């Protein structure tokens, strides 16, 4: 029946999953907080002309609506834009970096046959006002630490650079339209299509080899030397940036979790430098991503370098293999005669840190069905008190 249906892509979070999400969220936010990032909240609704236009999410994925004044609003499609807006308008007035954290849901319309959620929660951090490679390393190390704190140890963070492929494409192709075609193949990870398209281009065998060699630039720091052989002079500084980043991440103790992927292309068009994606060993999709976006705050009238990341709670739960949390609550069931004693007992147990449901016997139709979901049950009925352990 229609009354039980939900809008496409929207999902209910029932108690077991809610508890699992709460536990994972807490492990992430606890570590981000310990690194000195201050948490903030932004409105679910933003103006389309500000956050909506500046978002890197495709237009057809935005949820739009009109307010009473006829202005177009959007449900926030990501958190980077809203935090950039806040930082530009209210917070970035000091001559030192700003560290902001968040835990919030974002909204992106999905195709009906895709089966993907249109609403999902992200936990993340943004470092605004620091353009150094150390800042890039900090947010990557923080993302790695947060994942470990959540209990995930088998993961990789693939690191690339938004400008590296572009440098090669512009030098070899000299045409933005041609470059966009190759960039799309990389974004879709359609490497077969990429190779076939490169072979069809009217280029010298040397230039074709350079474009094809880009696909092989994955691995440790050693691939930077290979990159220097195919990237032109203008791209050498980008390669040096990646080498410096690797050295800093080694100091953080993150080397085992990182690898370079120099043909990485992101769907987030505002990235201007280092970018990265997080993969878990047992799932086949990205569970988090981030990167540097030095131009975004300028669109809000306060230019500043920035970098950050977001981790998806739903995908992290799947990567962790967490089952829905079962209730750890106790139940206290009472009759009228011992109501006062039952209330006192329940309050004492709660003060000790237990979760306690207090239930009048008169409100229960099937006592066996109700009590089987509780860890322990204590009865205050008639003249007696009786305990039943789960």
Curated annotation (Swiss-Prot):
Keyword Cytoplasm among UniProt keywords: yes
UniProt entry tagged with the keyword Transcription: no
Pathway membership: Amino-acid biosynthesis; L-histidine biosynthesis; L-histidine from 5-phospho-alpha-D-ribose 1-diphosphate: step 1/9
Primary localization: cytoplasm
Keywords, in A-Z order: Amino-acid biosynthesis, Cytoplasm, Histidine biosynthesis
Superkingdom of this protein's organism: Bacteria
Entry-linked Gene3D superfamilies: 3.40.50.12590, Bira Bifunctional Protein, Domain 2
Gene Ontology cellular-component annotations: cytoplasm
Annotated localization: Cytoplasm
GO molecular function, one term: histidine-tRNA ligase activity
Pfam families linked to this entry: HisZ-like, tRNA-synt_His
InterPro entries: aa-tRNA-synth_II (IPR006195), aa-tRNA-synth_II/BPL/LPL (IPR045864), HisRS-like_core (IPR041715), HisRS/HisZ (IPR004516), HisZ (IPR004517), HisZ-C (IPR053846)
Signal sequence residues: none
GO terms classed as biological process: histidyl-tRNA aminoacylation; L-histidine biosynthetic process
Quaternary structure, from the entry: Heteromultimer composed of HisG and HisZ subunits.
Family under the similarity heading: Belongs to the class-II aminoacyl-tRNA synthetase family. HisZ subfamily.
HAMAP family registered for this protein in UniProt: HisZ (MF_00125)
Extra facts: This function is generally fulfilled by the C-terminal part of HisG, which is missing in some bacteria such as this one.
Function in brief: Required for the first step of histidine biosynthesis. May allow the feedback regulation of ATP phosphoribosyltransferase activity by histidine.
Protein name per the record: ATP phosphoribosyltransferase regulatory subunit
């Amino acid at each position: 029946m229609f009354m039980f249906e939900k809008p496409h892509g929207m999902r209910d979070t029932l108690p077991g999953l809610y508890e699992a999400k709460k536990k994972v969220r807490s492990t992430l936010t606890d570590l981000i907080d310990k690194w000195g990032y201050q948490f903030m909240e932004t409105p679910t609704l933003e103006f389309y002309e500000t956050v909506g236009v500046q978002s890197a999410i495709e237009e057809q994925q935005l949820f739009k609506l009109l307010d009473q004044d006829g202005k177009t609003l959007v449900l926030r499609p990501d958190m980077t834009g809203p935090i950039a807006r806040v930082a530009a308008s209210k917070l970035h007035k000091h001559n030192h970096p700003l560290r902001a954290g968040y835990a919030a849901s974002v909204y992106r319309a999905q195709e009906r046959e895709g089966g993907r959620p249109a609403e999902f929660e992200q936990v993340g951090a943004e470092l605004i006002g620091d353009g150094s490679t150390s800042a890039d390393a900090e947010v990557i190390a923080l993302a790695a630490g947060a994942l470990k704190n959540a209990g995930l140890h088998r993961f990789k963070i693939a690191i690339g650079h938004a400008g590296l492929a572009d440098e090669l494409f512009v030098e070899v192709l000299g045409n933005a339209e041609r470059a966009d075609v190759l960039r799309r193949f990389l974004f879709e990870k359609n490497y077969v299509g990429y190779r076939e398209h490169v072979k069809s281009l009217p280029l010298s065998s040397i230039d074709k080899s350079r474009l094809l060699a880009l696909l092989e630039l994955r691995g440790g720091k050693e691939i930077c030397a290979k990159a220097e052989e195919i990237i032109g002079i203008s791209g050498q500084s980008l390669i040096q940036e990646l080498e410096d980043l690797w050295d800093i991440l080694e100091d953080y103790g993150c080397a085992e979790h990182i690898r370079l992927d120099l043909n990485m292309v992101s769907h987030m068009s505002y990235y201007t430098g280092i970018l990265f994606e997080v993969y878990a060993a047992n799932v086949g999709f990205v569970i988090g991503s981030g990167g540097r976006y030095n131009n975004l705050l300028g669109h809000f009238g306060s230019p500043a370098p920035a970098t950050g990341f977001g981790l998806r709670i739903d995908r992290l739960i799947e990567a962790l293999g967490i089952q829905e949390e079962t209730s750890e609550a106790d139940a206290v069931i009472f009759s009228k005669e011992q109501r006062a004693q039952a209330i006192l007992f329940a309050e004492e147990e709660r003060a000790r840190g237990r979760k306690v449901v207090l239930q009048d016997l008169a409100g229960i139709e099937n006592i066996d069905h109700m009590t089987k979901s509780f860890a322990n049950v204590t009865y205050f009925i008639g003249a007696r008190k009786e305990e039943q352990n789960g």
